Amino acid sequence: KIVQALSSMPPAARAGKAAVCRLAFCNRDGGVHSGVLNFLPEMGMPMQHIDRIIRSKNVFTAQDGIDTARELAIAIAGDRIVAVGKPDDVIAAAPAATPVLDYGEQFVCPGFHDAHLHFFHTSVGSSPYMLMDMGTSEAALVQHALEFSQDLPDDAWVVTQGWRDYRWDPPEHPTKASLDAAFPDRPCVMYSGDGHTLWLNSRALEALGVTRDSEPPAGGSYDKDASGELTGIAHEAAAMQLLPRCLEWLGEGRIASAYADQMRRMAEQGITSICDMSLMPMPGCDFIRDDVYDKLQTAGRLGIRAHLFPTLLDDQSRLEELQVRYANNALLSAPGFKQFFDGVSSEHTAYLTEPYTNPRFPGDQGRLTVPAERVRKLVLAAAERGHTVRIHVIGDGAIHAALDIFEEAADLYGLPQHGHNTLEHLENLLPEDIDRLRKLNVVASSQPCHITLDPGGPERDLGLERSRIMWPFATYKQRGIRQAFGTDSPITAVTSMNVLYTAITRQDPKSHWPEGGWLPSERIDAATALRNYTLGSAYAAGDEQNLGSLEPGKYADLVVLDQNPLTIDPQELQATKVQATYLAGNLIYER
């Protein structure tokens, strides 16, 4: 791209810009070519200066159409890649004193990009202030929480995240009674593993002002027993509205420390970029803490490239203010909005076109957490102003309705000029909606580790027929649909090798269930999985011009692995270790 820009300039203009040096670069067809490359002053680098060259016999650039790793060298100046090509050519073209880091047979690829997570809860959940625990039963989890609480500050609420009652023995719904017995005087809040339900004790309900007469917000509910008394369970919007207040005691200092620690853990996983997604559909509750990111960057402690997606509201000023603030910020950006549309299948809140196979009441087909007409108006208003939207949709009914809205937006305003609309999770689809994704240029953003999160759950809730069209990664590839991969952390762990392992094998990263993979026809090869986790995620962030592949002009975000995922047995993937991680050309982790 830089060569093309130079070629279009008059000779005098080129000469006036800078002296040129000869470098090799790699074209999209995979061939290595030589060309003239100029270090332009606007890149902020001295003329003919390269900070370092990284070489390896196994470099996977993640470019479309190149599914192999090759022997290449990557020249880096500042935070950008300036050349990729044959090692001898790149080294010969660089100044003699340029450092060359030779990784031998180790595997080099773009830094991993988690396309969907919730960084506040991921960070706090890994801190000393929140217990991450699914528990094996209600009693066991309460006991763990009691032990955990002994080391908490005096002002702390007891907060846990991760419970999944359908995986307990016995699989019973919990109530506040067990929490009240353990914590009669201290607020205790347990946040479910799917992120859509809260389980609270009486002291927490009292502190939050929730009584049996309280009206839940639209799209939410409070469970009650036969006498009308609160059981301590809040669902969807009701849970989401309460959660921020349950965490106010943390304060900015503790949160910033948790963020910095989590960024270091991400670097250990080879993750250099994230899409931090709004967790709540209500104003002021989305947990997108731009103030914390700003504080860390000012202190020189921002160790990740973060794309922020706040909640879509009638007032779009928050996103637009962030876009102005981050216009020239290489590490922070706000590409678009996040919008909720339905819930989750395990709680029967994902919206289906037909009732659940195991209905909890007649006509049980889930529900839209935000009315369709409301979402339509919000998305169309965003499209009119040129903003992209990423919509949480799990059930086939919600997916179909969201595509209808994107189609109307395209008819009225055209496809987005910058970035891409994205559907998040999209677990079970109507067959006819798969091709609509390609037609509307919508990115399918999935979290591979969700596949085995609830063993037997799809068949239990949806039946065999609908379960055959779930997380169809291979079908997406065959139909030419752009995919992005993430974790939805803290719903599943931020473990990069687990993302790749589950996408390739469709087996659980812990139990390795089932043998041969769940819906094995939808397994994908390692090159596709890597591309989805790098270049595909950059598409979801609307930043594929700067991220996602190892090409001249893109940011120098790289990861070095001790094994080649393209050639090893997939069952060995989880033993693969990150050897080094580079962000913006700087080494931020080394094993």
Q: Where on the chain are the PLM-derived regions?
A:
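Short, Lys/Arg-enriched N-terminal segments with co-localized hydrophobic residues
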Residues: 33-46
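Acidic (Asp/Glu)-rich catalytic clusters
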Residues: 299, 323-329, 438-439
